[in-house]
Amino acid sequence: MIVLADHHDRQFRYLRLSLTDVCNFRCGYCLPKGQQLDPQRPALLTLPEIRHLIEGFVALGIEKVRLTGGEPTLRSDLVDIVRAVAAVPGIRRVALTSNGWNLRDRLADLQAAGLTQLNLSLDSLDAARFQAITGSSRFEAVMAALEQAIALRLPILKVNAVLLKTLNYPQLSDFVEFVRDRPISIRFIELMQTLDNHDYFQQEFLSGSVLTEQWLAQGWQPIKRDRTAGPAQEYCHPNYQGKLGIIAPYSPNFCQNCNRLRVTSRGALRLCLFGTGEFDLRPWLQHPDQRSQLLEQVQQTLSFKTAGHQLAEANSGDTRNLATYGG
């Protein structure tokens, strides 16, 4: 089997596929100016195009697919997409990242279709603070989705919270207590600077090392990562059912173990979340006979992948916001 690899000795077995660039939340760290979409942008990838895309990437060694947005549950054909992705031989894991606003009543169907992992965005466990961060009053709906996911015993269930110095870090102990009796993982993501959130970033950034130092002092132990795992370093504790984690893109050598590629909701391959430029794959997603051309295009494009991003130099590439590419 072919294994995708770049010039920096990194292998890629994990694909993040955005299903839409539209989001119905207005998180200050992502869309501080609201969402401004180009009305002339191409149509979203269709189900047949998605199927051809996944089959091609599996032939290149991809084992895990994460469906992101924007907000992927805004797609009415989401269950069909999950089913199509899960049905491709070679796919070991189908994951979904969602804000949970309209997820509770769809989870059973998604699980039956082949969903094996859910990452739920939840930046606060307090309704008022949640609304202040996200611009949404759907806190109860998100919590209901989380409890439903626990009840359904999804194989992997994680909560993502963007680490914010004044808005949720003071409530860190609430998150830690939340996993005491719940078999979930809560991961804190360092706030990342984009072209749109400069002021917000300056006010709210906090290094993830602040959290890990506390956790290690409290007896939390690091867990070895799977080869298809994302960038989080997770920690376990004998007195807690759940886990804690940190995604720290500003830490040294963050990119040296990169194992994932991104395809936008319009079919463009993006080599780095904070890079520049995209490579259109859509012309090779129209028919199975184009498979060899698709594989060749992906392999050629991978030669342009750089060793790492330049966030530490305040260079966000051409990333205006995270909703466009799914974070």
UniProtKB/Swiss-Prot annotation:
Any single GO BP term: Mo-molybdopterin cofactor biosynthetic process
Name of this chain's protein: GTP 3',8-cyclase
Binding, [4Fe-4S] cluster 2: C255, C258, C272
GO MF term set: 4 iron, 4 sulfur cluster binding; cyclic pyranopterin monophosphate synthase activity; GTP 3',8'-cyclase activity; GTP binding; metal ion binding; S-adenosyl-L-methionine binding
Protein residues bound to [4Fe-4S] cluster 1: C23, C27, C30
Assembly information from the UniProt record: Monomer and homodimer.
Name of the gene this protein is made from: moaA
The organism's place on the tree of life at top rank: Bacteria
Cofactor: [4Fe-4S] cluster
UniProt binding sites for S-adenosyl-L-methionine: Y29, G70, S121, M192
EC number: 4.1.99.22
Purpose: Catalyzes the cyclization of GTP to (8S)-3',8-cyclo-7,8-dihydroguanosine 5'-triphosphate.
Enzyme class: lyase
Ranges of residues in domain Radical SAM core: 7-232
Catalytic reaction equation(s): GTP + AH2 + S-adenosyl-L-methionine = (8S)-3',8-cyclo-7,8-dihydroguanosine 5'-triphosphate + 5'-deoxyadenosine + L-methionine + A + H(+)
Binding residue positions for GTP: R16, R66, T97, K158, R260, L261, R262
Organism taxonomic ancestry: Bacteria, Bacillati, Cyanobacteriota, Cyanophyceae, Synechococcales
Native species: Synechococcus elongatus (strain ATCC 33912 / PCC 7942 / FACHB-805) (Anacystis nidulans R2)
Family membership noted in the UniProt record: Belongs to the radical SAM superfamily. MoaA family.
Chain coiled-coil ranges: none
Pathway in which this enzyme or protein is active: Cofactor biosynthesis; molybdopterin biosynthesis
